[in-house]
């Protein structure tokens, strides 16, 4: 499991019965200096754009005052849909950061914009992001 491999606790639910002393989604939202959602689906973008907090990931993001990086990945038609583009604008206006999506071949066999950015592009973005900041005692939370 991820817990075994990383030797860190993993979180799955909004409320963990074993850690009732603190509210996990609030404490998690405070731990990281940058939160990355990878991949970010059209559905997830919709939840964030309307402030729907129904699971651990959405509650962490809505409770956070940290930088949030979204890495969209979806079918080209989903990406270009007016609702998705409206949600993109709303999230950009809220201050969310985006990498991609890129043009390329999709898992479904179609070609176009919607492919998740490559690990190299994401690494380059993160390196640039953190090169501009003092990294002493900083943490990154991946959702």
Question: What are the roles of these predicted feature ranges?
Answer:
Residues 73:
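Cofactor-binding loop segments of dinucleotide-utilizing enzymes, especially the Rossmann-like FAD-
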